[in-house]
Amino acid sequence: MTISNTRPITPDLIASHGLKPDEYERILNLIGREPTFTELGIFSAMWNEHCSYKSSKKWLRTLPTKGPRVIQGPGENAGVVDIDDGDCVVFKMESHNHPSYIEPYQGAATGVGGILRDVFTMGARPVAAMNALRFGSPDHPKTRHLVSGVVAGVGGYGNSFGVPTVGGEVEFDARYNGNILVNAFAAGLAKTDAIFYSKAEGVGLPVVYLGAKTGRDGVGGATMASAEFDESIEEKRPTVQVGDPFTEKCLLEACLELMQTGAVIAIQDMGAAGLTCSAVEMGAKGDLGIELDLDKVPVREERMTAYEMMLSESQERMLMVLRPEKEEEAKAIFVKWGLDFAIVGKTTDDLRFRILHQGEEVANLPIKELGDEAPEYDRPWTPARAPSPLATNDVPQADVSDALLKLVGSANNSSRRWVYEQYDTLIQGNSLQLPGGDAGVIRVEGHETKALAFSSDVTPRYVEADPFEGGKQAVAECWRNLTATGALPLAATDNLNFGNPERPEIMSQLVHAIKGIGEACQALDFPIVSGNVSLYNETNGQAILPTPTIGGVGLVRDWSKMARIRFAAANETILLAGAPESWGTHIGQSVYMRDIHGRTDGPAPHVDLGHERKVGDFVRGLIEDGLVTAVHDCSSGGLALAVAEMAIASGIGATIDAPAEHDPIPVFYGEDQGRYVVTVAEGSAETVAARAKAAGVALPVIGRTGGNAVQLGDARPVSVDELRSAHEAWFPNYMGGDLAPDN
């Protein structure tokens, strides 16, 4: 259906574009007339939450974004961090939540495609991907279908494009029943003197369209991603984009080849709001106007309107400002790769965004007010309310070994092998640590010893209980996971997934989580260099668990000394770095309370950032000096799960003592922060103990490796085979449909 640009602008039409009455008034005051239909669509796309961050911008500004290694912080397609020797890592994490719920395969696939494009737009070749996935309860009728589609979509795109998936998360909770989360991360490598930016410079220069043709897929996608779901969800299926990883691979190679010619002045990928957003961002950043002639845009469907072309989110497309003398050379590269190359406009000096179609001017708007001067809100938020502590004697009991078996085989703590074996984890030939450990690690090509570590973390149940502590914990756990491989954590990207910010209690979650993230990043020298905010993750008024995912990158100076989680040998000493006197104390919000006793009460664990840093720096020093043989951070499931995972990974058992006079439940299942399980060979034990004493780090000996079972204190031993069977069984059984879902 062709929609006229002179369609009457009614209150219903304004509301259907996600614009509030006061925002429409602002448009009228800004342009001094009623907008055309195309202009209304452009404002809707640029002023929605997905593109403008209007509810979160005030708080995002408070995050630490600078550091000695930060070359580019937030505001570009991705963050850029120096990794020495003239190399840099370019990375970002972004959500594709709403599309993935409506159309799981394409939603997840184009989420991967979009984040890869953000990275190579900056001039970097993608070298690693991660995906943090959150689904509804296993017994919800849609969950299995969504898991299957999303995992296939992530694998289908990443594998075909040729980037290894090195890590991620998969979690289930009934609060995601109506809104799943698909947070995609990508990282690439570039030279520090060859980074490309999106800021247009120079007047009268050609604006070039690159890549695939424009269709009607994804029209209105960014607006959909800024609204809650309701009963009309199926009608939103046409707003999901369709991806082609092979075209994207060609686009990558063509862009990197073009960048070597010196032809590129500015480049921006077409993501949310397509041609509109990319053109506005390039012009607004450079204080330039942009004029586009839509008759020149390569299309794959007939009779497309200006509105559809401006708002299409067809994939695998770029916009570029080009040096005119390089036009023929640039065109030849794209023709060689079988891609479209079309000059569709020019830069101007009047700060206007002008759109021509079939000889008519269909839009003429002020570019700055569309872009970096979009509306910004200081939404009301309620004060923080931390839950009361559990009573001292409120420690529900269970058999320690039964609990261990149940937790290692539970929906949220079982092996994710079923997921990551559908991803190519080895392509490019640089993978050193695959999913299943604390962090994924890849070698930096062309360098003998250097590697990069990647981790993605958040504990939503902590954030719901206490957004400030939960925000701190997400950063601390990511930093800890990188450290556990021996990496120096460099910087992070944040993907903030929350409900409707117009509700003060939800806005409060967002505000306090950002405050916690900021405090932790500051204390740990772990700046935020890129990110994404996804709000309105609600269905019929039911919000998701607040989920501020943190993706982090660390530098391993010598990968031959890198630590892994698996026990290296029998008869080694097991130590607990950073342990409190009783080894573990905090069971509020623990998986033990949730999965064994069905309780979600109590406070989140406190994160002492000074302690976190001291213990982490100490452990990293041990790894770099070759003094430890295995390392695993203590997080979900506490000491018990950490030891069990180390045993499962190695096939070697462990005997863990228990401190006298202490209840074994918090000792083994407490989720106190800032702890690492480490093993040392006989010859290193005294050296390590002396270093711990000098550093002021608690490092009690808690047991020994060996045998074929895990024994926790006085509890009955559980064989490693039994633990592995339980750990590996849940996911394939569930996806095969022959498992009680809550097992």
UniProtKB/Swiss-Prot annotation:
It comes from the Bacteria. GO terms for molecular function: ATP binding; magnesium ion binding; phosphoribosylformylglycinamidine synthase activity. ATP binds at residues 53, 92, 494, 531. Mg(2+) 1 binds at residues 94, 532. The lineage of its organism: Bacteria, Pseudomonadati, Pseudomonadota, Alphaproteobacteria, Hyphomicrobiales. GO terms for biological process: 'de novo' IMP biosynthetic process. Belongs to the FGAMS family. This is Phosphoribosylformylglycinamidine synthase subunit PurL. It holds the Pfam family FGAR-AT_linker. It comes from Rhizobium meliloti (strain 1021) (Ensifer meliloti). Part of the phosphoribosylformylglycinamidine synthase complex involved in the purines biosynthetic pathway. Catalyzes the ATP-dependent conversion of formylglycinamide ribonucleotide (FGAR) and glutamine to yield formylglycinamidine ribonucleotide (FGAM) and glutamate. The FGAM synthase complex is composed of three subunits. PurQ produces an ammonia molecule by converting glutamine to glutamate. PurL transfers the ammonia molecule to FGAR to form FGAM in an ATP-dependent manner. Its main location: cytoplasm. InterPro entries: PRibForGlyAmidine_synth_PurL, PurL_linker, PurM-like_C_dom, PurM-like_C_sf, PurM-like_N, PurM-like_N_sf. NCBIfam families: FGAM_synth_II (TIGR01736), PRK01213.1 (NF002290). The active site is at residues 50, 96. The gene is purL. It is found in: Cytoplasm. CDD domains: PurL_repeat1 (cd02203), PurL_repeat2 (cd02204). Keywords: ATP-binding, Cytoplasm, Ligase, Magnesium, Metal-binding, Nucleotide-binding, Purine biosynthesis. Monomer. Part of the FGAM synthase complex composed of 1 PurL, 1 PurQ and 2 PurS subunits. The keyword Ligase applies. Gene3D superfamilies: PurM-like C-terminal domain, PurM-like, N-terminal domain.
